[in-house]
Amino acid sequence: VVVPNLYIVEQPQADALRAFVERGGYLVVGPFSGVVDATEKVHDGGAPGLLRDLLGIEVDEQWPIADGLTEHIDYAGETLTVPSWSEWLEVDDDVEVRGTYASGELDGLPAVTRRAAGAGSAWYVSAMFDPSGLIPVFRDVLCSAGLPAREHTDVEVEVVTRADDTTDYTFYLNHGRTPVTFEIPAAAVDLLTGSRHEGRLELDRYGVAVLAAPRAESIPFATLIPVKEDA
């Protein structure tokens, strides 16, 4: 479950998210979350409010980045760009720091954290990245959940998989003006055209395909697509 900016948090929401994680779910919470209740009253202790115990972090100070400046985060050896928003975090002893600020006033402080809870884990992302910056973060989340991740670097491409008990349905959408080609590791049938594809799928500009494959032969990865800034 990904909650990019859950500004308003009430107790039922916090309880549901905790139950989800403790049952084995993976929760990713974005910056400026858990700030107020439904009446716009700031939670005692500040953000992330009712999610504080689950995430194991406290936002000591919200740290907007001035226009024209950028800061950076070191994430497993990769340098991620932060153009607009960061937060000063205090973390509990049982929290694992996955990414660290690598410039500016927050240099050396935690930026992305993970805390185990029950059978799952709760992650907090304290910065607003540029679109490509989320790729290594979600690669890490998927890997820790035992889900291989395959990336497509074209921000105008979207790939989403849905499934029932027997079949995976993978939706390919090309939002761009140029054709794109995908490598697919399993034979599949396009439900829109009836065509069978093996190894490769080519989509024209603004093209769409819905590929169906048996679960045993289904595409064994998730594809990460960064959101366009002007979307």
Please report, for each region that a protein language model flagged, where it lies by residue.
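N-terminal Rossmann-like NAD(P) cofactor-binding module of classical short-chain dehydrogenase/reductase
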Residues: 2
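A conserved amphipathic helix/loop scaffold
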Residues: 5-231
